[in-house]
């Protein structure tokens, strides 16, 4: 091999290593998320939740910049029939989290037989029109800033009450809902941490949202501290722990399927399966103290709690030989008492959900890690996906076909009845590691060819 060929080969090799290093850094920035699914002991049936539903992941991230951080969203798309040239987003999102920690997602939960609204207290830099995908339809909303940091939200597809407020309030007459959003604007302890505000309406069929007439609204300054890695975070939430009641039941409030972020306990631990798990507990975010799972059966939500030690270590044990669950599913195993003791089984006679417990039982609380930067990312949301049996495709809204289609697809391995599908959509300006890898290969080849021509 001549000296020129040796130099050529060495240069090409160094370029490959350099590009791979860049790809790995971009991949690591996104981190993984962990998802908790309600798992039932027994087969699927009408009215049950989906079993370890595979979340469809596309190639790109979508981010919306705000004054105080980045809103990470899933299920976004560039609409072919956008309004006034603005892009429309199908969103199921989230809360603001510093980039060195990663992203944490929460489902948007659509209420059934109950009125629910919430506030979004972080201002957008620009008005957006976006879709909100829920159980059986897609609604298009418009966010328009007014004056004094107020916002007007309008449902463009159905009759809704237009509200201006110092924070953002969603009210949809036909499809009442809530979603949760945190911000860096207001602080609870004057330490530059961020807060969360959640407003709850009553359930007396009163169409007006009025704090003075709303028994379930608690605007107290209750603060709860949580920790992301080495960073202390505080939130503002309800201090009384009230729930919204649905017809004939109490304690019916829930946030649906819970997206939570896992954080390694310490760098000394060699077992990467040990995490601190952050989720909702009594209307606030915190380390898993009482693990809450909400089940929907015959339009009745049942709450199950398992008391844990605060800041408990949890081991994620892989699930093996479970046909209802794909890979990357785990059981939660505690460091002291084995598996979570409390679980739910379905009485096959009358369909009621019963509480029972066994330290050796593994049927409850399956969780699934979503490998955002995994080599297996292309196993999600590819051509192997099939159309779900859910009804969102029958949406009567005027939102885009693309968004509706995305909301009704899931992987062929999973049976789903919930139709909340969080798929990463398409946006030409936002990059996920998978797309970087895809586009890097031809770029590498072109660079090598140019080097060969030059020498």
From Swiss-Prot:
What membrane topology is given? Answer: Single-pass type I membrane protein
Q: Which residues cross the membrane?
A: 435-455
Residues carrying a glycan: 136, 148, 210, 298, 421, 432
Show which residues sit on the Extracellular side of the membrane: 29-434
**Where does it primarily localize?**
membrane
Q: Which GO terms describe its cellular component?
A: membrane
Please state what the protein is called: Putative uncharacterized transmembrane protein DDB_G0290991
């Amino acid at each position: 091999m001549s000296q020129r060929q040796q130099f050529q080969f060495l240069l090409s090799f160094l370029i490959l290593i350099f590009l791979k290093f860049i790809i790995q850094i971009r991949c690591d920035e996104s981190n993984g998320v962990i998802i908790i699914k309600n798992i039932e002991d027994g087969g699927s049936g009408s009215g049950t939740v989906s079993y370890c539903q595979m979340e469809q992941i596309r190639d790109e991230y979508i981010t919306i910049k705000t004054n105080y951080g980045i809103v990470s969203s899933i299920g976004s798309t560039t609409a072919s029939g956008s309004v006034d040239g603005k892009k429309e987003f199908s969103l199921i999102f989230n809360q603001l989290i510093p980039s060195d920690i990663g992203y944490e997602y929460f489902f948007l939960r659509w209420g059934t037989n109950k009125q629910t609204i919430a506030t979004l207290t972080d201002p957008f830099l620009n008005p957006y029109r976006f879709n909100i995908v829920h159980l059986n339809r897609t609604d298009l909303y418009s966010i328009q800033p007014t004056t004094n940091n107020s916002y007007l939200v309008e449902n463009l597809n159905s009759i809704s009450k237009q509200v201006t407020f110092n924070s953002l309030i969603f009210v949809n007459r036909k499809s009442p809902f809530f979603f949760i959003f945190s911000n860096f604007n207001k602080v609870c302890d004057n330490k530059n941490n961020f807060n969360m505000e959640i407003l709850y309406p009553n359930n007396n069929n009163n169409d007006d949202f009025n704090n003075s007439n709303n028994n379930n609204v608690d605007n107290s300054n209750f603060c709860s501290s949580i920790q992301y890695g080495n960073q202390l975070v505080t939130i503002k939430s309800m201090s009384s722990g009230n729930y919204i009641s649905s017809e004939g039941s109490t304690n019916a409030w829930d946030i649906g399927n819970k997206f939570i972020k896992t954080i390694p306990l310490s760098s000394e631990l060699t077992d990467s399966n040990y995490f601190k798990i952050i989720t909702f507990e009594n209307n606030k975010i915190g380390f898993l103290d009482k693990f809450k799972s909400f089940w929907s059966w015959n339009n009745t939500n049942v709450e199950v709690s398992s008391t844990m030690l605060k800041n408990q270590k949890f081991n994620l044990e892989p699930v093996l030989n479970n046909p209802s669950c794909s890979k990357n599913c785990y059981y939660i195993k505690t460091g002291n008492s084995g598996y979570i003791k409390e679980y739910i089984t379905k009485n096959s006679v009358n369909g009621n959900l019963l509480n029972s417990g066994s330290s050796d039982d593994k049927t409850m609380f399956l969780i699934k890690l979503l490998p955002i930067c995994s080599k297996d990312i292309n196993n999600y949301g590819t051509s192997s996906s099939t159309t779900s049996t859910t009804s969102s495709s029958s949406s009567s809204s005027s939102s885009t076909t693309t968004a509706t289609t995305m909301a009704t697809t899931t992987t062929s391995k999973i049976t789903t009845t919930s139709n909340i599908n969080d798929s990463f959509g398409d946006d030409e300006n936002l990059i996920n590691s998978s797309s970087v890898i895809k586009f890097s290969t031809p770029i590498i080849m072109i660079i090598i060819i140019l080097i060969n021509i030059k020498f």
